[in-house]
Amino acid sequence: MKKILVIGDLIADYYLWGKSERLSPEAPVPVLEVKKESKNLGGAANVANNLISLKAKVFLCGVVGDDLEGKHFISALKAREIDTSGILTDKTRCTTLKTRIIAQNQQIVRVDKEIKDPLNADLRKKLLDFFTEKIQEIDGVILSDYNKGVLDFELTQKMITLANQHHKLILCDPKGKDYSKYSHASLITPNRAELEHALHLKLDSHANLSKALQILKETYQIAMPLVTLSEQGIAFLEKGELVNCPTIAKEVYDVTGAGDTVIASLTLSLLESMSLKDACEFANAAAAVVVGKMGSALASLEEIALILNQTHPKILPLEKLLETLEHHQQKIVFTNGCFDLLHKGHASYLQKAKALGDILVVGLNSDNSIKRLKGNKRPIVSEKDRAFLLASLSCVDYVVVFEEDAPIKLIQALKPDILVKGADYLNKEVIGSEFAKETHLMEFEEGYSTSAIIEKIKRTHND
């Protein structure tokens, strides 16, 4: 179980749910007939709550007011088994409270009660002391900045410096214009509007997105800069090139807290040694779960697995693939096949193909295509499952299913730098080679084939 230290602004989320069917006689405003009330953990506490849902151990550090809301807040945290030993009480401020009025599942107004003044020197010192005490025993740090006074410039920089000195991953969810506050963090997660506001740069093109992320990396020394783009997913840099990790299509009911879910799931994914690309895919799946619920919702590992099993961000229709790769300057490698009963020979072949370039696109024969080519008893594994298995390989960047017997239209549209086929195509015409800059024939690993596996299963069954 990973241990995560979360520091930031603590917010109590209060919801009034009901229906509104008339206007007030006192003013032209709707009247809400309250049917239900609920309280949620918000801000940095929602990040902590998301981490708990993902099976992490969480230490939460922040400030509440000396009031009833603060006491209820601490009790709610303890009920979720979140360590509250780093939470301080400030008698000069109220606990930040956001009240949302929901009518017919639509938010109609929000009322904020808060004090955003910076913390006094004594409280800042106590927070830093707690951070210093815990830094050696935890695996990673999240700074959840809602601009409510906890994370000022000096405290933020001291915490980032300490985390780096102890070689701890530190991620920041930023607010405000001055991103020098987050200099030298491992990763920051601004959304499009926040990054535009901070850099005074309109992120309306791939070129400007790339420029913005380069600024974060070079000017602010952010090791892994990225930007969340709502329905367009997450964009980040890989070897200096812009990469977009597409979102998982799902009906959106409420985006409240989605950013907290993203940074929580990114942190745990990276601590589990996932690549940034795979971590973003996991975070997109987690976000897809929570936006399908009302309020500051949570995503469980089981729900995320269900989303990923339903689809996979690497599995794209041709039109979406072309849109994704439109501005890539990296070398694209393409190969295709049935990949029925995925085995070591397939994996070895795909790893070698990926090594020839930067992005590996795999064209996958559909079920109908395989039946025409190999008979009605094939495929053994459905196209949905075959596509998911291929997409799960780290060497595969994208999978495209095609219905034709041969992927000529796919290759013509993609125009790969390198077209890879098996060495059994020696002295044969390689379909689509005229649309690729280079054709490479590759040996298969001996002793592995789907047909041989099927025959072995038959023999074993007959015995």
Curated annotation (Swiss-Prot):
Give this protein's Gene Ontology molecular function annotations.
ATP binding; heptose 7-phosphate kinase activity; heptose-1-phosphate adenylyltransferase activity; phosphotransferase activity, alcohol group as acceptor
Keyword set for this entry?
A: ATP-binding, Carbohydrate metabolism, Kinase, Multifunctional enzyme, Nucleotide-binding, Nucleotidyltransferase, Transferase
Which Gene3D superfamilies does the entry link to?
3.40.1190.20, HUPs
Question: Which InterPro entries did the record assign?
Answer: Bifunc_HldE (IPR023030), Cyt_trans-like (IPR004821), PfkB_dom (IPR011611), RfaE_dom_I (IPR011913), RfaE_dom_II (IPR011914), Ribokinase-like (IPR029056), Rossmann-like_a/b/a_fold (IPR014729)
List the residue ranges of the region (Cytidylyltransferase): 334-463
Example GO biological process term?
A: ADP-L-glycero-beta-D-manno-heptose biosynthetic process
What's one Pfam family the UniProt record gives for this protein? Answer: CTP_transf_like
> Where does this protein hold ATP?
N191, R192, A193, E194
Residues of the active site are: D260
Reactions performed catalytically: D-glycero-beta-D-manno-heptose 7-phosphate + ATP = D-glycero-beta-D-manno-heptose 1,7-bisphosphate + ADP + H(+); D-glycero-beta-D-manno-heptose 1-phosphate + ATP + H(+) = ADP-D-glycero-beta-D-manno-heptose + diphosphate
Task: Give the record's pathway.
Answer: Nucleotide-sugar biosynthesis; ADP-L-glycero-beta-D-manno-heptose biosynthesis; ADP-L-glycero-beta-D-manno-heptose from D-glycero-beta-D-manno-heptose 7-phosphate: step 1/4; Nucleotide-sugar biosynthesis; ADP-L-glycero-beta-D-manno-heptose biosynthesis; ADP-L-glycero-beta-D-manno-heptose from D-glycero-beta-D-manno-heptose 7-phosphate: step 3/4
State which Enzyme Commission number(s) the record gives: 2.7.1.167, 2.7.7.70
Q: Which PANTHER family match?
A: BIFUNCTIONAL PROTEIN HLDE
Q: Which NCBIfam families match?
A: cyt_tran_rel, rfaE_dom_I, rfaE_dom_II
Family stated for the protein in its record: In the N-terminal section; belongs to the carbohydrate kinase PfkB family. In the C-terminal section; belongs to the cytidylyltransferase family.
What does this chain do? Catalyzes the ADP transfer from ATP to D-glycero-beta-D-manno-heptose 1-phosphate, yielding ADP-D-glycero-beta-D-manno-heptose.
User: What does the record note on quaternary structure?
Assistant: Homodimer.
What HAMAP family does the entry give?
HldE (MF_01603)
Q: What is this protein called?
A: Bifunctional protein HldE
Q: What is the lineage of its organism?
A: Bacteria, Pseudomonadati, Campylobacterota, Epsilonproteobacteria, Campylobacterales
